[in-house]
A protein has these predicted regions:
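Hydrophobic faces of well-ordered beta-strands that scaffold small-molecule active sites
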Residues: 143-145, 196-198, 242-244, 330, ...
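Active-site-proximal helices and loops of the catalytic beta/alpha 8
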Residues: 232-240, 255, 259-265, 323, ...
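C-terminal beta-strand-rich structural cap/linker in extracellular carbohydrate-active enzymes
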Residues: 4, 37, 88, 564-578
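Conserved, mostly hydrophobic/aromatic
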Residues: 33, 147, 188, 198, ...
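Substrate-binding/active-site clefts of carbohydrate-active enzymes
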Residues: 142, 148-194, 201-319, 323-324, ...
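The feature marks proteins involved in alpha-glucan
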Residues: 1-30, 52-144, 154-169, 173
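Aromatic/acidic polysaccharide-binding cleft in carbohydrate-active enzymes
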Residues: 150, 372-374, 378, 419-426, ...
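Carbohydrate-binding surface patches
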Residues: 30-32, 516-552
Length: 578
């Protein structure tokens, strides 16, 4: 409710869950609250020990909360508390821009300071150490490179006309394999990549391999288990991690369990491995199958993971490849169509084998319910992708809205998760960003700057560094640009420089956001970050014409390695050391 110019009570939101109230470790506790945008002059957190009575010791403390994120309609305030309490009781003190003051505890508002602990929020999460959101220490802000193996590199001669065919079809066999990736490992490393992610490599009859027929076999067209072991070893020698694609939502029709159902029908002992509505099975092209499958594709029947046999089989598969080849992560295909119950057990199983395994979910929307520390570590950040599409490709949002959309995710996601978000501008499931921008390379130039200069794990889709084109799937999966005549060397050097700057100045992605200025009419964004003694201004010009930033002249521009003259060209960026 809004009463004249007074505080907007209905916009205030806090919950005692792992998004708004959680222990980062044994000594650090984070509390957040959401309020109406620009409504508050000051937010103060009051907290005290739940179990020590006042007559014994006064444990009451207060701490000013910092505004850490801004979305379209809300501000997010945060307090980080160093504490050694068994259990915490707390409440908020709000003072709005008109001077009105109110206290908020246990989901109730009060005009007087709260003294009754029963009227405060109660959070014992620092006691429950087994529930703390622990993520792999190696992962935060690392740079990921996505490869579609059949189209990346081949070890046998492939007709050049076929390799660079456009548009390409699912039937075009380019003979890419694991050995080809191994032979180009130096190229991947030289770009500055930290994590290599491959789409499915297990046995399948399709080009994309998302319809698995044998989870325990590398597809023969890609190589052998020994090839995968060598690939992982060579990646590790270069300081890179390897993530594989886990397709556990569905199988292919030739997978042994479904093949048995096709042969034996109702008498099959595997009939409960899937969701079958009736016999005989119907899956002719053009008709809706009478069994659950991925997207009504009869060639991808959905597994019944609530069946203990199926759950064990799939979990054993995941653990097997960790033990066998020492991989570093699983990317979970169609992860949001599988139950929370399964993923909780899955996490326990794979983390027991390798504690610092990275678990990445595929989900195209906000994923807070999967990111509470007991399922996934992070997700493919499609909201980031859609935000950039809206800003640069479709030009339907302002720079202010773009920054606000970024703020929404930061304000809602767990502190440990945010630096692990896989920020992408395209993937094997989307048209290339360049295509969506009508081949405007300047727009991709700027999109890469956003991708590589913001917190998270930027995921570069193979070939983006050479400005590879491509429409929607399957055309986005063309043969990699290995011949210089096809490569955009200027784009490559831009990607490489962005990665170098990102890695050489931790302030860029780890620094606290100390200021944000957006000019909608000009189409410009300036983000100020501070980290210890270093302060950096990141300037993004989202318009087609050059803009002046005279306040930063004579400072050093990390991207050009020259003194900044105050000018930023259209669809360009600058990183200024202050």
């Amino acid at each position: 409710m809004k009463r004249g110019n007074f505080m907007e009570y209905s916009a205030i939101f806090h919950d005692m869950d792992k998004r708004f109230s959680y222990a980062v470790d044994k000594d650090l506790f984070v509390i957040r609250v959401q309020v109406k945008k620009d409504d508050m002059k000051e937010v103060i957190l009051h907290y005290e020990d739940k179990y020590i009575p006042m007559e014994r010791k006064d444990t009451r403390k207060t701490v000013p909360m910092k505004k850490v994120a801004v979305s379209q309609f809300h501000d997010y305030y945060e307090a980080q508390i160093k504490m050694h309490l068994i259990c915490l009781r707390y409440f908020f003190e709000f003072t709005d821009t008109q001077g009105e003051k109110v206290y908020y505890g246990n989901y109730e508002f009060d005009k007087e300071c709260i003294t009754n602990r029963d009227r405060m929020f109660d959070c014992p999460q620092n006691l429950r150490e087994e529930e703390m959101f622990e993520v792999p220490e190696w992962a935060a802000n690392k740079v990921v490179y996505q490869i579609f193996p059949s189209r990346f590199a081949a070890t046998e001669p492939v007709d050049k006309e076929l390799w660079y065919k456009a548009p390409i079809t699912p039937m075009d066999d380019l003979h890419g394999n694991l050995r080809g990736i191994i032979e180009h490992m130096d190229d991947i490393q030289n770009l500055g990549i930290d994590v290599l992610y491959m789409t499915p490599i297990f046995q399948s009859n399709s080009c994309h391999k998302y319809d698995t027929t044998d989870y325990y076999q590398i597809d023969p067209s890609f190589g052998t288990t020994e090839d995968l072991k060598e690939l992982v070893q060579k990646a590790h020698e270069r300081g890179m991690k390897v993530v594989l694609d886990a397709v556990y939502n569905h199988t292919g029709r030739e997978f042994f369990a479904f093949a048995d159902i096709l042969e034996n029908g109702e008498k099959s002992k595997y009939r409960d491995w899937y969701f079958i509505d009736g016999f005989p099975l119907k899956s002719e092209w053009g008709e809706i199958p009478n069994f659950k499958c991925f997207g009504y594709y009869g060639g991808m029947p959905k597994l019944n993971l609530k069946n203990p046999e199926v759950e064990k089989y799939i979990t054993d598969v995941a653990c097997y490849w960790i033990k066998e080849c020492d991989i570093d992560g699983w990317r979970l295909d169609v992860g949001d169509e599988i139950s929370h119950f399964f993923w909780k057990n899955f996490r326990k199983a794979v983390k027991a084998v390798k504690k610092d395994m990275l678990i990445i979910g595929e989900i195209w929307h906000y994923a807070g319910d999967f990111l509470e520390g007991d399922e996934w570590d992070t997700v493919m950040n499609y909201p980031f992708y859609l935000n950039l599409i809206d800003l640069l490709a479709d030009e339907k949002i302002t720079v202010s809205q773009f920054v606000q959309n970024l703020g929404y995710l930061k304000g809602r996601l767990h502190k440990n998760c945010y630096p692990l978000m896989w920020n992408l501008i395209d993937s094997h499931d989307t048209a290339r960003f360049l295509h969506l921008c009508n081949d405007n390379k300047k727009k991709q130039h700027l999109a890469a700057a956003f991708q590589l200069l913001l917190p998270g794990m930027p995921m570069i889709y193979y070939g983006d560094e050479y400005a590879m084109p491509g429409a929607n799937d399957p055309d986005c999966r063309r043969g990699m640009y290995w011949d210089e005549e096809y490569q955009d060397k200027e784009m490559y050097e831009w990607y490489k420089r962005l990665i170098q700057v990102r890695k050489s100045h931790a302030c860029i992605v780890e620094g606290e956001l100390a200021g944000s200025v957006t000019e909608d009419e000009e189409g410009t964004i300036v983000l100020i970050r501070k980290n210890g003694e270093e302060t950096i201004a990141m300037i993004f010009n989202c318009s087609s014409s050059a803009k002046k930033f005279n306040e930063y002249t004579q400072k050093y521009n990390l991207l050009t390695e020259n003194t900044f003259d105050g000018n930023v060209e259209g669809f360009d960026a600058a990183v200024i050391v202050l």
